[in-house]
């Protein structure tokens, strides 16, 4: 994994060769990176209800062997109980981790892509220890972060730091939606977590959207019967 630095005036990027198989953190060349590395991922981008949430996680090298055996790839495929268990482990192992989010009002105002990047930026800026490099899930760099960045498509399958961030963001958002579900029981949020399930869409057609639905998303623009 050869590291080559490309620098511009306001945006620093550090491309990493992604040709190696397995976790990036297990590559012998990972030691070429001197300093803290944060993984950044988001959840809730496709939901109809609630905020888009991002997490930034900085893991020590000592955590890598443990997490490599923990099957943390693709948090969406894990059971809720397993995600919660892993989140507790990551919280204990991590040097630092933080949550950032963008509200439904912000999503409607600036669009979901920009809101997602805003949530990511907020999670990074909340870190008490600033990393020298952020591994960003996806193909969009985060603007106005004066640190090195590397975007990685399907990053939660390539980087332990990103996979850990995915789990922390998912558990945090699911917990929030569970609490909000008691206020809006008609939308079946406990089951769908704010996503467009059949019951959720039927409830939107019957009751209309709540103040926490994304009004810029077409399914939320249905007038109630």
Swiss-Prot record:
Where located?
Cytoplasm
Paste the cofactor note: Manganese or magnesium. Binds 1 divalent metal ion per monomer in the absence of substrate. May bind a second metal ion after substrate binding.
Q: Which reaction does it catalyse?
A: Endonucleolytic cleavage to 5'-phosphomonoester
Residues forming the RNase H type-2 domain are: 35-225
Identify which top EC class this enzyme belongs to: hydrolase
Q: What is its EC number?
A: 3.1.26.4
Q: Which cofactor does this sequence's record say it needs?
A: Mn(2+); Mg(2+)
Q: Name one GO cellular component term.
A: cytoplasm
Biological function: Endonuclease that specifically degrades the RNA of RNA-DNA hybrids.
For this chain, the family text in UniProt reads: Belongs to the RNase HII family.
Q: What is this protein called?
A: Ribonuclease HII
Ranked from the top, the taxonomy reads: Bacteria, Bacillati, Cyanobacteriota, Cyanophyceae, Nostocales
């Amino acid at each position: 994994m050869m590291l080559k630095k490309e620098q511009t005036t306001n945006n620093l990027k550090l491309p990493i060769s992604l040709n190696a198989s397995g976790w990036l953190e297990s590559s012998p060349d990972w030691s070429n990176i001197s300093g803290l590395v944060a993984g950044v991922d988001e959840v809730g981008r496709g939901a109809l209800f609630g905020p888009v949430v991002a997490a930034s996680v900085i893991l020590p090298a000592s955590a890598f062997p443990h997490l490599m055996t923990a099957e943390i790839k693709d948090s969406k495929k894990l059971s809720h109980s397993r995600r919660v268990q892993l989140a507790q482990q990551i919280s204990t192992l991590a040097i630092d981790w933080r949550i950032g989010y963008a509200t439904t009002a912000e999503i409607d105002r600036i669009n979901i892509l920009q809101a997602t990047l805003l949530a990511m930026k907020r999670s990074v800026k909340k870190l008490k220890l600033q990393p020298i490099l952020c591994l960003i899930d996806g193909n969009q760099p985060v603007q106005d972060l004066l640190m090195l960045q590397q975007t990685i498509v399907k990053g939660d399958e390539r980087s332990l730091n990103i996979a850990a961030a995915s789990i922390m963001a998912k558990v945090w958002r699911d917990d929030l939606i569970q609490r909000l579900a008691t206020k809006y029981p008609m939308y079946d949020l406990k089951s769908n977590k704010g996503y467009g399930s059949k019951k959720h869409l039927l409830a939107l057609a019957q009751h209309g959207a709540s103040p926490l639905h994304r009004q810029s998303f077409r399914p939320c623009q249905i007038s109630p019967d």
